[in-house]
C-alpha cells in the first residue's frame, strides 16, 4: 500500500511505551473500506491459500486470538494491515517500498504464473503460485508468536521458503522492542531494531541506512537478516561502500562464485545497496520523511539554502533522537499532516499554486485508516496494548483508543458496509472529508474541536478503565505482570471478566464516536451547503 510509517522507541515515547503507527493508503483512484475486528483461534485458517498469489501454506494448529483492521472486501484477500495478539505482540504490514534493478536481477520476485494451455495437452504448463505479500503476512505471523523477535524469525523463514512478489517493510513490536523488516528481492530480508531512544520514519522507500553485518551474524542484538545475505551481496556485487577492500580495513571476503571473492564491510548502507533514489522518490517519498523529522527536531535548519536536509534529500536519516519525547498526539498529527507551515501545504496560503501541490502529503484523500499500536509497560498484560484507530482521510478525523485484548469489537467499527452508509465510522468519516475539503477554512474549526474532544475523551476512558482493572487486581496479586486477570492466567471466569471490562470501554468509545462524528457531519454539511456555488442569499417573501 502507499503508506507512511512512524515508529517510536520506548525511551523516545512520552510514557515508555513502544509505538508503531502507519497510514494505510489505497492506490490512486481506489478507496478500500476498512473495519476493526477480533479473530478467535477457531476462525483462523489451518490451511491458507492466498487470493492474489495462490500460494498454499499449512498453518500451526495453535493460533492465539488477535485483533486487526482489515479491508471489508475480500477481493484481494484478508489484508489484515495492523493488529495485536493476546501476547501483546503488534504488527503493521506493509509499508510498500522499492528495490533497485540490481537486486531484482539477482533475486527476482516470486510472481504467480497462470497455467498455460489445456490440462490434457502435451504443451500444458501448470500454474506456478507466487510468494507471500501484504495480503498474507499478518495472518501468517501474528497468531503464532509471543515476542517481536519470534515474529521476525517466523517472517524470515516464510520469506526464505515461499518468497514474495512485492517489496515491503513490516513492523513487529512488543513491550520491549520494535523491529523493522525490509524484503530484499524475492527471498532475502534485513531487519533492524529501532533504538530505544529514537523514532524512525518510513515513506514508501527502502529506508534502513545502516546495517551491522557483524552483529547480524553474531550476537544479533540490533540486526537480523536472511542466512545467506553476505554471499548474496558478494555474488551480485551489491555493496557500494567506498574504501580499499582489505580485511585490515574492516572488510571480510566472501565467495562471489567463478573462483573469485569479494570483500564486504562489517557495516554498510542498505538504502544505497538495495534501494532507489529517483525523481519520483523526490516527489512522493523523501518530502514525507523530511516533514516528520522537521516537526520532531524543529530546532534544526530545515528551510534555509544551507539546510542539511531538504524535501528532496536522499540521505534523510532512517532514525534519530527526537528533541522531546513523542506523544500519541504527535503521531496522529504527523500521519494526518499536509506540510502545515510550509509552502507545500495544499490547504495553505503561502508559496504558489505550484508549490502547494509539488509533493505528496502524508494525509491524503485515499487513506483507509491510521492505526497506532501502543504497548504499555506500566499496566498488566491484559490491558497492555491499545490500538489508536482512525478511518478515512487524516486531516478530517482523529485517532481513538481501543483495547486490543478482546473477543469482539464495537459494531460501529466492525460492521463497515461495502457501500456508503452513515451507520458506521468509516463511511461517515469519508463523507465528512469530501464535504469539508472544498471549504477547509470554514469547516476546520469544527474538525479541530472534534479531534481534540476524541483524543481527550479517549485518554480519560483509558485511564479510568486501567484504574478499574487495577482495583480488581489488588486483592489478587501485586505482580502486575502475572495477576490472575491478565488474560493468560487464572480461571475462565476471571479472564472473561477482564474481557467484559475492556469490551465495555471499547463500546463506550464507539458510542462517543457515533454521537460526535454524526454531529461533525451535520456541522460541515450545513456550513458547506451555505457555500455552494449556486447559493443565493435572497429568499422569497414567504420564507421564514
Model regions and ranges:
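Glycine-rich, aromatic-lined ligand/substrate-binding cores of catalytic
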Residues: 232-379, 383
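A contiguous strand-loop segment
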Residues: 2-134, 154-303
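Short, charged, surface-exposed loops that flank catalytic or proteolytic processing sites
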Residues: 144-150
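Short, well-ordered beta-strand elements within core beta-sheets of diverse protein domains
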Residues: 138-144
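Surface-exposed intrinsically disordered loops and tails
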Residues: 115-122, 349, 481-488
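Substrate-recognition/cap regions that form aromatic- and gly/pro-loop-enriched pockets
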Residues: 339-475
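Short Pro/Gly-enriched beta-strand edge/turn motifs at strand-loop
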Residues: 60-66, 152, 349-357
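Histidine-centered catalytic/metal-binding microenvironments
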Residues: 453-544
Amino acid at each position: 500500500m502507499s503508506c507512511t510509517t512512524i515508529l517510536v522507541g520506548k525511551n523516545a515515547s512520552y510514557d515508555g511505551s513502544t509505538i508503531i503507527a502507519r497510514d494505510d493508503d489505497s492506490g490512486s483512484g481506489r478507496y478500500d473500506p476498512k473495519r476493526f475486528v477480533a479473530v478467535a483461534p477457531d476462525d483462523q485458517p489451518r490451511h491458507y491459500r492466498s487470493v492474489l498469489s495462490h500460494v498454499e501454506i499449512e498453518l500451526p494448529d495453535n493460533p492465539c486470538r488477535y485483533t486487526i483492521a482489515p479491508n471489508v472486501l475480500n477481493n484481494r484477500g484478508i489484508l489484515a494491515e495492523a493488529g495485536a495478539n493476546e501476547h501483546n505482540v503488534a504488527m503493521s504490514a506493509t509499508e510498500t517500498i522499492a528495490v533497485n534493478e540490481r537486486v531484482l536481477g539477482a533475486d527476482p520476485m516470486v510472481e504467480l504464473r497462470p497455467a498455460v494451455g489445456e490440462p490434457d495437452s502435451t504443451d500444458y504448463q501448470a500454474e506456478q503460485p507466487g510468494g507471500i505479500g501484504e495480503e498474507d503476512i499478518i495472518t501468517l505471523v501474528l497468531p503464532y508468536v509471543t515476542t517481536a523477535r519470534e515474529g521476525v524469525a517466523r517472517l524470515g523463514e516464510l520469506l526464505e521458503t515461499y518468497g514474495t512478489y512485492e517489496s515491503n517493510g513490516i513492523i513487529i513490536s512488543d513491550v520491549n522492542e520494535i523491529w523493522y523488516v525490509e524484503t530484499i528481492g524475492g527471498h532475502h530480508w534485513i531487519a533492524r531494531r529501532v533504538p530505544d531512544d529514537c523514532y524512525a520514519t518510513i515513506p514508501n522507500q527502502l529506508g534502513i541506512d545502516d546495517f551491522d553485518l557483524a552483529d547480524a551474524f553474531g550476537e544479533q542484538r540490533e540486526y537480523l537478516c536472511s542466512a545467506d545475505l553476505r554471499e548474496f551481496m558478494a555474488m551480485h556485487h551489491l555493496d557500494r561502500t567506498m574504501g580499499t577492500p582489505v580485511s585490515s580495513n574492516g572488510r571480510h571476503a566472501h565467495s562471489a562464485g567463478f573462483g573469485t571473492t569479494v570483500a564486504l564491510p562489517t557495516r554498510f548502507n542498505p538504502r544505497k545497496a538495495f534501494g532507489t533514489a529517483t525523481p519520483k522518490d523526490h516527489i512522493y517519498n523523501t518530502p514525507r520523511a523530511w516533514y516528520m523529522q522537521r516537526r520532531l527536531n524543529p530546532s534544526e535548519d530545515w528551510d534555509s539554502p544551507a539546510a542539511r536536509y531538504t524535501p528532496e534529500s536522499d540521505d534523510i536519516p532512517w532514525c534519530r533522537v527526537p528533541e522531546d519525547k513523542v506523544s500519541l498526539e504527535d503521531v496522529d498529527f504527523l500521519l494526518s499532516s499536509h506540510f502545515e507551515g510550509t509552502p507545500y501545504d495544499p490547504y495553505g496560503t503561502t508559496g504558489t499554486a505550484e508549490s502547494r501541490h509539488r509533493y505528496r502529503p502524508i494525509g491524503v484523500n485515499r487513506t483507509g485508516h491510521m492505526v497506532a499500536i501502543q504497548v504499555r509497560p506500566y499496566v498488566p498484560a491484559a490491558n497492555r496494548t491499545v490500538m489508536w484507530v482512525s478511518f478515512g482521510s487524516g486531516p478530517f478525523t482523529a485517532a481513538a483508543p481501543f483495547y486490543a485484548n478482546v473477543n469482539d469489537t464495537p459494531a460501529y467499527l466492525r460492521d463497515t458496509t461495502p457501500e456508503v452508509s452513515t451507520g458506521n465510522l468509516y463511511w461517515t468519516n469519508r463523507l465528512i472529508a469530501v464535504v469539508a475539503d472544498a471549504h477547509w477554512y470554514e469547516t476546520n474549526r469544527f474538525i479541530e474541536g472534534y479531534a481534540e474532544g476524541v483524543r481527550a475523551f479517549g485518554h480519560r476512558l483509558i485511564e479510568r478503565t486501567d484504574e478499574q482493572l487495577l482495583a480488581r487486581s489488588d486483592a489478587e496479586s501485586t505482580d502486575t505482570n502475572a495477576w490472575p486477570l491478565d488474560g493468560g492466567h487464572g480461571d475462565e471466569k476471571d479472564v472473561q471478566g477482564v474481557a467484559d471490562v475492556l469490551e465495555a470501554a471499547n463500546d463506550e468509545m464507539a458510542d462517543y464516536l457515533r454521537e460526535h462524528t454524526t454531529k461533525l457531519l451535520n456541522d460541515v454539511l450545513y456550513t458547506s451547503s451555505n457555500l455552494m456555488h449556486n447559493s443565493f442569499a435572497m429568499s422569497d417573501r414567504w420564507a421564514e
